[in-house]
Amino acid sequence: MFGSAPAQADGCYTWTRTLSEGATGADVRQLQIRLSGYPGYGGVLALDSSFGPATRSALVRFQQAYGLAADGVAGSATYNKLYALQDDDCTPVNFTYAELNRCNSDWSGGKVSAATAKFNALVSMWKLQAMRHALGDQPITVTSGFRSIACNNAVGGASDSRHLYGDAVDLGAGPHSLCRLAQQARNHGFNGILGPGYPGHGDHTHVDHRSSRFWSASQCGI
């Protein structure tokens, strides 16, 4: 527990102990999900339930981003910030499942189970939340997320598009240019970044979590 500070109950998830390097368990994985947007340039944080050096580094970046004591230990101050950043369905406050799935209501029909597609979208939202904060807390426009095979075919998507796995998001221009979005995404755990200069991506920036890095947005210096 947190010593004299009482644990705060939260509608999505409540941590009941301080976490630091060496800890393992489901509560570590819940923390990692929310830190997945803070792996550092080109990094991807493993959601492996094990609090290792990479998790500590991601936590330090999160703490620094929000003006917390950057000690790499998750205690009440860190948890209170996370509680403030999440809604009761565990999505970050500035993104919704509905935004990430304009195809159907149940996440079915893709290349993975509905539960996996929905979870992948959740992780993407936490990455986008980190990216949004880094860009001055201005809105990020989501134009496409999960697609079933039928929805993907209807829009002419690639046959093995990451949208079919629920871990791809297309972003439109808004307060930030498409290039600014593509450039910033390099810091937030996306292995796939496609933007202006890549064929078919002149009107959006695509980010995803493919198995190995592929970044291509030549008009943006990527």
Where are these regions (language model features)?
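Active-site acidic/histidine clusters and adjacent loop/turn architecture
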Residues: 89-137
